[in-house]
């Protein structure tokens, strides 16, 4: 019984109806606390262990951990504020929230933080001390009031809040300045609001975050473990003006909630800078001119541009005067301009490069997921593994080794310089039984990675992995066989079914011919006198014969055993470059094997498409506007080059067209003959019906479209793009309400990354567990890779029922 059983026990307990006491704890799986003051007790369940922590009278129990294998309970006086957390199997650590919190609720009667100075800066006297003041309240007289050390407390329920006796003989006591918890109120824009309000400003009931009804959305709690998306409580996961929620009214997708502002000062946002560090959210300099030289509009002004980025709506962002700021998480400080024709622009802020930057500041907290589809493996205990897998056995993303969020740790590149602790890749720096990582889920400290152990014949990735290529299925095997009609056959059979030797393709005796020669068909493999199928004959490979009385005859080439290729699993590892189609990355050949080139009958590429089964291609309906006739189109499969097609490509006519009946921008093409599934031609997987891709999920687009003069034109290109929740995409400054529920947005709001003309109809695929799933069909956009204008894609999951019905009935 290992880690998974700890998880199972925890889930069973939380769902048992008796788990309410655990609401007062923060739990972390796979974490153990180094404790000096502790008790080891037997306990049959987590519930029993929690009860022992509550009942203990020898010391104040601030945390407990439960070991599932031994059914052992350890209650402890320490927590993460006073001790260190280490990684351990088969254990769940529970820490009381009240002792972790440094804020107060109400008058702070239950405050158990560690503030030990008054609001006037005087150090507090210890509660157990009698000097300089003899206390009325002490640990002996009030043992249940948490009178520890010299921490501020409120043992007498004073309406003014926590206080303490002071070390100043002239001042007996003074009040402490304790921050209000964001349970009954909010600081700033409520990004950390943790309360239970679940109605909107107009009184509508909130929809639960883990529900997709009545409104489908991308804020899935399991994908955003640090956003505290509990039940149907108002939250602010996307830098809105204040907490909000999706509503239970089908006619109102979302609305802001009416959360009062806290009366105490907000928490510190960290150091501020007069230069640009990161995205400049803490920039507090005085630059007030944009990159184009426009003067900034005052944040408090509404002319010439009306807006809601006001000092009142963003009280913690220092929107002073007309200085450039970044209140909403854009890529750099910006401002509205005084030019009525230019709503806003970024500002040119000098960089802080000369100042020291910590490793933690530079490290991304959740880098893009890079789990290989062509799964690599590890030898032994995996200490030598240097692959790029970055997901755990349960599908969680790995935390960067150089980051301390959400888990603080000592396994850093500096402390383990030879362990290959790069990015967030799975590693084994401490000789565990296999590669592992800290996770981006605050409640799960670490997990083993989703990697297999190498068999005796497999090679582990011990350096940055090269392109992984399987043998070309058209390469002659020992059996010298063919796929489909054998158009791609390149074997060395050279006799017909009757045993007659074949005539050389370059020869003109005994039979003269001019159509099928190495010169006229350079891509058909017309070598020597080998059997070939240059014209795609349904009878299979053939040749001109050496019998003067027989012009040609077929060859006896057996079919190859059908290869077993699962949907969504390319046999060449994709590059997964964070570049862009416009100015972006050339893909590894055949790493996106479902990519289709939709062409005119004359062979001109004009749209993309996606192979979803051997006989069916999905594309955009607007790609078929020029002609309703299937004969006007054909598809190319297995290509990397737009022109000068490779020998192995498959060219198939289209037999039928199916447009989505409600005129959405999606269409199905039925092929005249099934595609041959090879290592270069593999369908993408369809999503579950009505599945919603989580906000900020990293997905990929591919195509041969317009590259605006950048390198790699004519080769298949790829780009990695984050999905943007429709709620954000429909904001005024982005696509202003144009995106429908049957569509999704993806792109970098800073611009420079997008699909362009010629990519229409092509795939947007997202990696899930161990395969790529087709989530979008490239549909439309405002321009090409423009700032604040992400691309729009048809949401495939909304049409899966229609797609499957058409394929089943035709």
Swiss-Prot record:
Cellular compartments annotated: Secreted
Organism: Homo sapiens (Human)
Purpose: Plasmin dissolves the fibrin of blood clots and acts as a proteolytic factor in a variety of other processes including embryonic development, tissue remodeling, tumor invasion, and inflammation. In ovulation, weakens the walls of the Graafian follicle. It activates the urokinase-type plasminogen activator, collagenases and several complement zymogens, such as C1, C4 and C5. Cleavage of fibronectin and laminin leads to cell detachment and apoptosis. Also cleaves fibrin, thrombospondin and von Willebrand factor. Its role in tissue remodeling and tumor invasion may be modulated by CSPG4.
Outcome after substituting residue 374 to F: In PLGD; Nagoya-1
Means of activity regulation: Converted into plasmin by plasminogen activators, both plasminogen and its activator being bound to fibrin. Activated with catalytic amounts of streptokinase. Plasmin activity inhibited by SERPINE2.
Lineage, opening ranks: Eukaryota, Metazoa, Chordata, Craniata, Vertebrata
Reported disease: Plasminogen deficiency: A disorder characterized by decreased serum plasminogen activity. Two forms of the disorder are distinguished: type 1 deficiency is additionally characterized by decreased plasminogen antigen levels and clinical symptoms, whereas type 2 deficiency, also known as dysplasminogenemia, is characterized by normal, or slightly reduced antigen levels, and absence of clinical manifestations. Plasminogen deficiency type 1 results in markedly impaired extracellular fibrinolysis and chronic mucosal pseudomembranous lesions due to subepithelial fibrin deposition and inflammation.
GO cellular component, one term: cell surface
Residue span, Kringle domain: 103-181, 184-262, 275-352, 377-454, 481-560
Domain remark in the UniProt entry: Kringle domains mediate interaction with CSPG4.
Residues at the site labelled Cleavage: 78-79, 466-467, 580-581
Positions bearing carbohydrate: 268, 308, 365
Entry comment on modification after translation: N-linked glycan contains N-acetyllactosamine and sialic acid. O-linked glycans consist of Gal-GalNAc disaccharide modified with up to 2 sialic acid residues (microheterogeneity). In the presence of the inhibitor, the activation involves only cleavage after Arg-580, yielding two chains held together by two disulfide bonds. In the absence of the inhibitor, the activation involves additionally the removal of the activation peptide.
Protein name: Plasminogen
Signal peptide residues on this chain, from the entry's feature table: 1-19
EC number: 3.4.21.7
Subcellular location, principal: secreted
One Pfam family linked to the record: PAN_1
Assembly, per entry: Interacts (both mature PLG and the angiostatin peptide) with CSPG4 and AMOT. Interacts (via the Kringle domains) with HRG; the interaction tethers PLG to the cell surface and enhances its activation. Interacts (via Kringle 4 domain) with ADA; the interaction stimulates PLG activation when in complex with DPP4. Angiostatin: Interacts with ATP5F1A; the interaction inhibits most of the angiogenic effects of angiostatin. Interacts (plasmin) with iripin-8, a serine protease inhibitor from Ixodes ricinus saliva.
Disulfide bonds: 49-73, 53-61, 103-181, 124-164, 152-176, 185-262, 188-316, 206-245, 234-257, 275-352, 296-335, 324-347, 377-454, 398-437, 426-449, 481-560, 502-543, 531-555, 567-685, 577-585, 607-623, 699-766, 729-745, 756-784
Residues the record marks as site: Interacts with fibrin: 134, 136
Phenotype upon changing residue 591 to P: In PLGD; risk factor for thrombosis
């Amino acid at each position: 019984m290992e880690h998974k059983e700890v998880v199972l026990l925890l889930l069973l307990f939380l769902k048992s109806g008796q788990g309410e006491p655990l609401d007062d704890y923060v739990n972390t799986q796979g974490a153990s606390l180094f404790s000096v003051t502790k008790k080891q007790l037997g306990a049959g369940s987590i519930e029993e262990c929690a009860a022992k922590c509550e009942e203990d009278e020898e010391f104040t129990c601030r945390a407990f951990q439960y070991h599932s294998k031994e059914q052992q309970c350890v209650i402890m006086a320490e927590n993460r504020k006073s001790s260190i957390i280490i990684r351990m199997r088969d254990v769940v650590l529970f820490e009381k929230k009240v002792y972790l919190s440094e804020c107060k609720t109400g008058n702070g009667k239950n405050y158990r933080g560690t503030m030990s100075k008054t609001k006037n800066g005087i150090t507090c006297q210890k509660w157990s001390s009698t000097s300089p003041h003899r206390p009325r309240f002490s640990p002996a007289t009030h043992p249940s009031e948490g009178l520890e050390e010299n921490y501020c407390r409120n043992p007498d329920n004073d309406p003014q809040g926590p206080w303490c006796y002071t070390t100043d003989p002239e001042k007996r006591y003074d009040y402490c300045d304790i921050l209000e918890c964001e349970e009954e109120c909010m600081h700033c824009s409520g990004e950390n609001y943790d309360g239970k309000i679940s109605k909107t400003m107009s009184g509508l009931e909130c929809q639960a975050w883990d529900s997709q009804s009545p409104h489908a959305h991308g804020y899935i709690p399991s994908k955003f473990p640090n956003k505290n998306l509990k039940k149907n409580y108002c939250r602010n996961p996307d830098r809105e003006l204040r907490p909000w929620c999706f509503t239970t009214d089908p006619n109102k997708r979302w609305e802001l909630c009416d959360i009062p502002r806290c009366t105490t000062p907000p928490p510190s946002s960290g150091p501020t800078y007069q230069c640009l560090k990161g995205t400049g959210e803490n920039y507090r300099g005085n630059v007030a001119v944009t990159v184009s030289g426009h003067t900034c509009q005052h944040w408090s002004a509404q002319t010439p541009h009306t807006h809601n980025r006001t000092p009142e709506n963003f009280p913690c962002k220092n929107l002073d005067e007309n200085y450039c700021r970044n209140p909403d998480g854009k890529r750099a400080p910006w401002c509205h301009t005084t030019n009525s024709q230019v709503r806003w622009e970024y500002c040119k802020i000098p960089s802080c490069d000369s100042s020291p930057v910590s490793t933690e500041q530079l490290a991304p907290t959740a880098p893009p997921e890079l789990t290989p589809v062509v799964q690599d493996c590890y030898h032994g205990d995996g200490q030598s593994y240097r692959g790029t897998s970055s997901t755990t056995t349960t599908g969680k993303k790995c935390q960067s080794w150089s980051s301390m969020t959400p888990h603080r740790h000592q396994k850093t590149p500096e402390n383990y310089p030879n362990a290959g602790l790069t990015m967030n890749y799975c590693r084994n720096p401490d000789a565990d039984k296999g590669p592992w990582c800290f996770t981006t889920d605050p409640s799960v400290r670490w997990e083993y990675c989703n990697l297999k152990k190498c068999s005796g014949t497999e090679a582990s990735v011990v350096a940055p992995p090269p392109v992984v290529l399987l043998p070309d299925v058209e390469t002659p095997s020992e059996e010298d066989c063919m796929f489909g009609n054998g158009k791609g056959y390149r074997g060395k059979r050279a006799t017909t079914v009757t045993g007659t030797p074949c005539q050389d393709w370059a020869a003109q005796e005994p039979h003269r011919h001019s159509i099928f020669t190495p010169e006229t068909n350079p891509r058909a493999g017309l070598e020597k006198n080998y059997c070939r199928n240059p014209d795609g004959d349904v009878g299979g490979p053939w040749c001109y014969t050496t019998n003067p009385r027989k012009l040609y005859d077929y060859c006896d080439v057996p079919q190859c055993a059908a290869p077993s290729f699962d949907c969504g699993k390319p046999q060449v590892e994709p590059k997964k470059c964070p570049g862009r189609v416009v100015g972006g990355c050339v893909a590894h050949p055949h790493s996106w094997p479902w990519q289709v080139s939709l062409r005119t009958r004359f062979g001109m590429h004009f749209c993309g498409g996606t192979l979803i089964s051997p006989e069916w291609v999905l594309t955009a309906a607007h790609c078929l506007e020029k002609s309703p006739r299937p004969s006007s189109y054909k598809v190319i499969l297995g290509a990397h080059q737009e022109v000068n097609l490779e020998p192995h490509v498959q060219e198939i006519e289209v037999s039928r067209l199916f447009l989505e009946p409600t005129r959405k921008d999606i269409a199905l093409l039925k092929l005249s003959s099934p595609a041959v599934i090879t290592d270069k031609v593999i369908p993408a997987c369809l999503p579950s019906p009505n599945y919603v891709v989580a906000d900020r999920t990293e997905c990929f687009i591919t195509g041969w479209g317009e590259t605006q003069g950048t390198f790699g034109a004519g080769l298949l290109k790829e780009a990695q793009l984050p999905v943007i929740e429709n709620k954000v995409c429909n904001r005024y400054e982005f696509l202003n309400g144009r995106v429908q529920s049957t569509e999704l947005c993806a792109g970098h709001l800073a611009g420079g990354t997008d699909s362009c003309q010629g990519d229409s109809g092509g795939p947007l695929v997202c990696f899930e567990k161990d395969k790529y799933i087709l989530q979008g069909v490239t549909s439309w956009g405002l321009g090409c890779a423009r700032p604040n204008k992400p691309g729009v894609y048809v949401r495939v999951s909304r049409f899966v029922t229609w797609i499957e019905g058409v394929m089943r009935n035709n």
